[in-house]
A protein has these predicted regions:
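Nucleotide/phosphate-binding catalytic cleft detector across ATP-hydrolyzing
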Residues: 1-202, 221-232, 270-368
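Short beta-strand scaffold segments in enzyme catalytic cores
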Residues: 18-21, 212-216
C-alpha cells in the first residue's frame, strides 16, 4: 500500500457509486451529492448507524466541507445516503462524462480518498479509469486535472471535527474494464497470477450504472475499437423500466407512483426492493428480475454481434461490477466467470497498476 510514504489508491468513481481501494481498506458510497446547509432537527435522535466500523458509520454521515487548497475555494456538501435523506429533491448524481472538471464529481472522489487515508496528511498516487468510449478523448485531460492539494473537514459522524488533507501527486488513467484484467492477472510487484489470461482471447464485461464497458484482450493486449467498446445501457435502464411498471401498477390510484432512478436505487439498496405503499409495500423484485434479464440479453446479443469474428476462440469472459453480479446468471455467454469481489474489480486493478508504477519509479531512482 505504501511506497516511500506515498499512499497508492485505486478509484472507480462511477455514475452510481464511488469505489476506493487502498489495499487493506475499501470505501463505497452512493455517488449522490447536494449542497450542504445548517442542520437543526436532522441532528436529533439516531442519525447514524449504530453498528459497523468508524468508516461504515462515517460513510453514512457525509456532511463535509471540501477545500481546494490551491484556489482556496471551499464548498459545503451532503453526500451519499445522507444527501438522499436530508435533501431528496436536490440530491443528484453527477452525469458529466468528464468528471475531471466537474467540481461536484471531483469532490465525491476527494471525500472518498479522505475516508480511506489513514493519516491527517497524505501524499497520494492515484490510479483510476474512464469509460472505454471516452478513453482516447479524456485520458490526458484526467491525468492533468486529477492532482493537487485538497482538504476535507467532517462536520458529523465519528470523524466530526477532523480535517484530512491530501496532495494528489499524480494520476494514471486506464479504460474501465482494464482494471479488472489487471486485478485478475498481476500482483503489486508486477508478477503474473494467471498465465491462462495472457494467452488467446479474453473478454471483460463491466456493466455499470449508465453504461456497460467491454474490453477484449488478445495475448494480454487490449484490442482497439470495435473490439473494445461501450454499450449505452446499464442499471439505470433497468430502473427506468421498473419505474414505468410501478406507475402502471398504481395507475388506478388517485396518485399513481412516479419515481426515478435515484429513489429506486435506495429502495433496492436499503429496502430490499420493497416500495412503501398504502400501509404496506409493493415488492418490486419480480419486476427488477425481468428487467435485469432483459439487460443481460441485450448485453449478450451486442457482445456476440460485435465479437462474432472471434466466436469460439474466446476462452474466458470475466464479468465484473455490482451490476455484473446482478445480471451474471442471465448472461447468455459461454465461458463466463464472475470475479471475486466484483464491485471493486476496477478499483483494485487501478490500485495494482498504480503500485506497479510507483515500484518501477522507486527501482529506477535506486538504480540511478
Amino acid at each position: 500500500m505504501f511506497e516511500n510514504d506515498i499512499l497508492v489508491a485505486g478509484a472507480d468513481p462511477g455514475f452510481g457509486a464511488i469505489k476506493l481501494d487502498i489495499g487493506d481498506t475499501k470505501i463505497l458510497f452512493p455517488a449522490v451529492i447536494c449542497n450542504g446547509s445548517e442542520r437543526i432537527f436532522s441532528t436529533l435522535g439516531r442519525t447514524e448507524l449504530e453498528r459497523g466500523s468508524d468508516i461504515d458509520r462515517q460513510v453514512a454521515s457525509l456532511d463535509v466541507i471540501v477545500k481546494n487548497n490551491s484556489t482556496g475555494v471551499e464548498r459545503h456538501y451532503f453526500m451519499g445516503s445522507l444527501a438522499e435523506s436530508l435533501n431528496p429533491k436536490e440530491a443528484h448524481y453527477c452525469w458529466d462524462e468528464d468528471k475531471s472538471t466537474d467540481e461536484e464529481a471531483m469532490s465525491l472522489l476527494i471525500v472518498g480518498l479522505a475516508l480511506a487515508q489513514p493519516y491527517p496528511k497524505t501524499n497520494i498516487y492515484l490510479g483510476t479509469g474512464v469509460p472505454v468510449k471516452f478513453y482516447a478523448s479524456l485520458k490526458d485531460k484526467y491525468e492533468a486535472e486529477l492532482k493537487g492539494s485538497f482538504s476535507v473537514t467532517f462536520l458529523s459522524g465519528p470523524f466530526k471535527g477532523q480535517t484530512r488533507s491530501m496532495n494528489i501527486l499524480r494520476s494514471r488513467v486506464l479504460p474501465q474494464s482494464y482494471g479488472v484484467f489487471i486485478k485478475e492477472t498481476l500482483t503489486e510487484d508486477g508478477n503474473a497470477t494467471n498465465a491462462k489470461l495472457f494467452g488467446g482471447y479474453v473478454v471483460v464485461i463491466d456493466p455499470g450504472f449508465r453504461t456497460t464497458d467491454i474490453a477484449t484482450f488478445y495475448d494480454g493486449i487490449m484490442l482497439d475499437p470495435p473490439n473494445s467498446f461501450s454499450i449505452e445501457k446499464g442499471l439505470q435502464w433497468a430502473y427506468t423500466g421498473v419505474a414505468e411498471k410501478l406507475k402502471e401498477m398504481t395507475a388506478n390510484h388517485a396518485s399513481p407512483i412516479e419515481t426515478d432512478d435515484k429513489e429506486l436505487d435506495k429502495i433496492f439498496r436499503v429496502n430490499k426492493g420493497l416500495y412503501p405503499w398504502n400501509n404496506g409495500a409493493i415488492d418490486l423484485n419480480p419486476v427488477m428480475k425481468r428487467m435485469l434479464s432483459q439487460l443481460a440479453a441485450d448485453i449478450s446479443r451486442e457482445v456476440m454481434k460485435t465479437l462474432k469474428p472471434m466466436a469460439g476462440r474466446i476462452h474466458t469472459v470475466l464479468v465484473a461490477g455490482k451490476v455484473g453480479e446482478m445480471v451474471f446468471e442471465y448472461l447468455n455467454l459461454e465461458n463466463k466467470v464472475l470475479i471475486d469481489d466484483p464491485q471493486f474489480g476496477n478499483a483494485a486493478g487501478f490500485r495494482i497498476m498504480a503500485a506497479n508504477l510507483v515500484n518501477n519509479l522507486t527501482r529506477k531512482v535506486n538504480v540511478d
